[in-house]
Curated annotation (Swiss-Prot):
Molecular function GO labels: ATP binding; phosphoribosylamine-glycine ligase activity; phosphoribosylformylglycinamidine cyclo-ligase activity
Superkingdom of source: Bacteria
UniProt record similarity statement: Belongs to the AIR synthase family.
EC number: 6.3.3.1
UniProt catalytic activity: 2-formamido-N(1)-(5-O-phospho-beta-D-ribosyl)acetamidine + ATP = 5-amino-1-(5-phospho-beta-D-ribosyl)imidazole + ADP + phosphate + H(+)
Keyword field: ATP-binding, Cytoplasm, Ligase, Nucleotide-binding, Purine biosynthesis
Compartment(s): Cytoplasm
GO biological process, one term: 'de novo' IMP biosynthetic process
Name under which the protein is recorded: Phosphoribosylformylglycinamidine cyclo-ligase
Length: 331
């Protein structure tokens, strides 16, 4: 007789991981959560909205995970997972409600799984949303030992008549960029080709640790700005960089004109250019120091930037909108 454990699935380790995970998830619970982890499904009571619309998004972390494997640092990529989902739904003005995660591995290590969920929990706390469920899948022979994948699913809410869909964007509106924390979770397949020694010094730190800096979550500053200003469009700068993501906020045919010298380029991107990536290709791959973009009336620009600074963020007027063909023009 062959046991499940002999087939590569350790049920006891699974029970241990669940116990470790529960304490991290419970820290994220908000008043809408109706049950604890361990049920067949998570339940969340919707707040009182006049005409509510649920806004959802799903994403993963990609090959940034390989940096985490090699550095044996597992408690930050969970933040990335949350950020990649939450920042997307934020683009439509949605307030995050709850999050679910999915972790897959070849051999389950409870302590590693707990570190992953610790990161997810921290990301949810930053996003002011609840981690109400998830799945940890142990699949022997499918993943190599020591490797795993993580993905997430976020749900937010917005009043129907307050959804931001780009329909109010006009010729002459300005673009405000909010600084990123680094490459975030995109471009790592290219980074891994160029950066072989992750323990090499970079500005007093191992470059592997620098590359594991978590993706910035923009919920708190953006939700505060939405209370005061007419924000017409928003873009989360992810894979595809400026060229692919900024036009996604446009409902009509506009061109985003971006001044590359309007903000300081972070050193990590200058370093990647020095390793042999063409600058134009960088803007089509990385966020280049700007992780989130707002489209607003020109008259609000200075005050928005002041408010961002007061909230501890770095904001810059990086360009403007003109009639065009849903494209980006760098100057």
């Amino acid at each position: 007789m062959v046991s499940y454990k002999e087939a590569g699935v350790n049920i006891e380790e699974g029970y241990k991981s669940v116990d470790l995970i529960k304490k991290h998830a419970s820290k994220t619970f908000t008043k809408g959560v109706l049950n604890n982890l361990g049920s067949f499904a998570g339940m969340f009571e919707l707040p009182k909205y006049k005409n509510p619309v649920l806004v959802s998004g799903t994403d993963g972390v990609g090959t940034k995970l390989d940096i985490a494997f090699r550095m044996k640092k597992y408690n930050t990529v969970g933040i990335d997972c949350v950020a990649m989902c939450i920042n997307d739904i934020l683009c439509h003005g949605a307030k995050p409600l709850f999050f679910l995660d999915y972790i897959a591995c070849g051999k389950l290590e409870a302590e590693v799984a707990a570190q992953l969920v610790e990161g997810v929990s921290n990301g949810c706390i930053q996003s002011e949303c609840a981690l109400i469920g998830g799945e940890t899948a142990e699949m022997p022979g499918f993943y190599r030992d020591g490797e795993y994948d993580i993905a997430g699913f976020a749900v937010g809410i917005a009043e129907k008549d307050e959804i931001i869909d780009g329909s109010k964007i006009e010729d002459g509106d300005i673009l405000i960029g909010i600084a990123s924390s680094g490459p975030h979770s995109n471009g790592y397949s290219l980074i891994r080709k160029l950066v072989e020694d992750l323990h090499k010094d970079f500005e007093g730190n191992k470059i592997g640790n620098t590359l594991l800096t978590p993706t910035k979550i923009y919920v708190k500053p953006v939700m505060k700005l939405l209370e005061k200003y007419n924000i017409k469009g928003m873009a989360h700068v992810t894979g595809g960089g400026f060229y692919e993501n900024i036009p996604r906020m446009f409902k009509e045919d506009f061109t985003a004109v971006i001044n590359k010298k309007s903000y300081p380029l972070p050193n990590i991107f200058s370093h990647l250019i020095s390793l042999g990536i063409e600058e134009d290709h960088m803007y089509n791959t990385f966020n280049m120091g700007i992780g989130f973009v707002l489209c607003v009336n020109e008259k609000d620009g200075e005050n928005i930037i002041k408010d961002l600074i007061e909230m501890g963020e770095k904001g810059y007027k990086i360009g403007y909108v003109k009639k065009g063909d849903k494209s980006v023009e760098l100057i």
